Amino acid sequence: MKTKFIFITGGVLSSLGKGLAAASVGALLQARGLKVTIQKLDPYINVDPGTMNPFQHGEVYVTDDGAETDLDLGHYERYLGIPMNQRNNYTSGSIYHRVITKERRGDYLGGTVQVIPHITDEIKSVIMNLASDDLDVALVEIGGTVGDIEGQPFLEAIRQLRSDLGRDRCMYIHLTLVPYLAAAGEHKTKPTQHSVKELRSIGIQPDIILCRCEKAVTDDLKHKIALFCNVEKDAVFSAVDVKNIYEVPLSFYEEGFDQKIAIMLQLPAKNPDLSKWQELVDTCANPQGKVTIGIVGKYVDLKEAYKSLHEALIHGGVANKLAVELKYVNSELITDENVAESLAGLDGILVPGGFGSRGVEGKIRAIRYARENKVPFFGICLGMQCAVIEFARNVAGLPAANSEEFDEQTPDKVIYLMTEWFDFRSKQVERRDSGSEKGGTMRLGSYPCAVVKGTNAFTAYQAEKVDERHRHRFEFNNAYLDKLKEAGLVFSGLSPDGELVEMVEIKDHPWFLGCQFHPEFKSYPMTPHPLFREFIKAAGKQAVKSKR
């Protein structure tokens, strides 16, 4: 079977949940035995989100091949349980960059380079590159909202693909908002009508309309939407708000959403096996206990900045049959005087990754509190670096210890800029310096890690070698390895050549671990990451202890 394409657009307003909708549809088709992938096309001009402010964009999701991508790729991976790569995310910036590179190379033979056909052809090219003999369905999510100026080339490209592929290989799903007005006691369809009108004005007639709503849309209202939007009566579906995002595939299945897609695209009529999804939802709904985890960071005002982290902690809870309540603590507000009050009642403390000096001292205070008060601690990327700094200052007798990122003049740079490292994918030595460009110049993607036996890390992984995803410029300074080891710091994970420290721990503590990589990017609801599983297990023991 030739690869078939499903294009998902959004109307009325942004953040309706196109990514979750795409991931849920993909999961349903996958449960039918089909091979599925998902692609996200973002209309913004940035080449990738790697240098974007988390407050504007949210999390930057890193793939195995080192691509810095949209956070929706995290949803795709978690719902499908398969890794994404660079081909699964493009932006206007990356598309234009490809076209301009070709123009400079002379590929267009002196012709005038225009949005149509050159930009639209490039968009079609990256979409069609997904097609292969072993892929049944490719879902393509168009970022932004219908009507956005920057999104027009993408919509034009997918309009053309309908003619290129034919109706049996291409369909359009339009996600739109159907607000419920409590005062009037009814849903309003006008925003949806206008959104579809805008879409049809550029030549795209949606095949299915998915209505994001607080309450399920009635059959009468579905028929009204179908009439005004020129779709079949049974092609209007509700996307109702749910308590748990992992309920969405089950909700779509109950609506018959996947069945309609299968009929329209003439896909094999096999009933999906959703037993694992049902088991997951049941486990989430019936926990045997609860833990409270504090996330100490500086992007706490925008939870999307820690999206994968949030989900990975939930996964750890699922593995231990525990509900996980998250408390976000602004590290900039933590002082020596209020640290105990700020972190009171927590069963576990997690310090996530980040960049820059703002809020770092608050993180270090939180880590000291966790270490001295025997509260389970998990440090990720910058969180591990801060744990090393705290240990060096307060245990190893290096009061001026710091990271070169925060203080270039410190006499004890226990964390310093990585200037070269061996890339196990390209089999080459990568080099960077302080003058390198910011975008795409970090240690990015999946790298192997040797795990030391007899450590918390080995207890979690039960393996001597693992592969984890990285996103950092700074690393532990090996000049301090012996001194910190003598003071009691355990180096439980190293690069295979022994040159780079990947994990550290502390003995005589319930659970204290820092890792230089980002394990949250490899945690799936069906297969929680081992480190999150063990962290939540330790937090569960702490919760029981606190109740006594």
Swiss-Prot record:
ATP binds at residues 15-20, 72. Allosterically activated by GTP, when glutamine is the substrate; GTP has no effect on the reaction when ammonia is the substrate. The allosteric effector GTP functions by stabilizing the protein conformation that binds the tetrahedral intermediate(s) formed during glutamine hydrolysis. Inhibited by the product CTP, via allosteric rather than competitive inhibition. Keywords: ATP-binding, Glutamine amidotransferase, Ligase, Magnesium, Metal-binding, Nucleotide-binding, Pyrimidine biosynthesis. GO terms for cellular component: cytosol. InterPro entries: Class_I_gatase-like (IPR029062), CTP_synthase (IPR004468), CTP_synthase_N (IPR017456), GATASE (IPR017926), GATase1_CTP_Synthase (IPR033828), P-loop_NTPase (IPR027417). The active site is at residues 381, 518, 520. Pathway: Pyrimidine metabolism; CTP biosynthesis via de novo pathway; CTP from UDP: step 2/2. Its EC number is 6.3.4.2. It comes from the Bacteria. L-glutamine binds at residues 354, 382-385, 405, 473. Mg(2+) binds at residues 72, 141. It holds the Pfam family CTP_synth_N. One of its GO terms (molecular function) is ATP binding. Residues 1-267 are annotated as: Amidoligase domain. It is an enzyme of class 6 (ligase). One of its GO terms (biological process) is pyrimidine nucleobase biosynthetic process. It catalyses: UTP + L-glutamine + ATP + H2O = CTP + L-glutamate + ADP + phosphate + 2 H(+); L-glutamine + H2O = L-glutamate + NH4(+); UTP + NH4(+) + ATP = CTP + ADP + phosphate + 2 H(+). The keyword Chaperone does not apply. Residues 292-545 form the Glutamine amidotransferase type-1 domain. UTP binds at residues 14, 188-193, 224. CTPSs have evolved a hybrid strategy for distinguishing between UTP and CTP. The overlapping regions of the product feedback inhibitory and substrate sites recognize a common feature in both compounds, the triphosphate moiety. To differentiate isosteric substrate and product pyrimidine rings, an additional pocket far from the expected kinase/ligase catalytic site, specifically recognizes the cytosine and ribose portions of the product inhibitor. Belongs to the CTP synthase family. Homotetramer. Catalyzes the ATP-dependent amination of UTP to CTP with either L-glutamine or ammonia as the source of nitrogen. Regulates intracellular CTP levels through interactions with the four ribonucleotide triphosphates. This is CTP synthase.
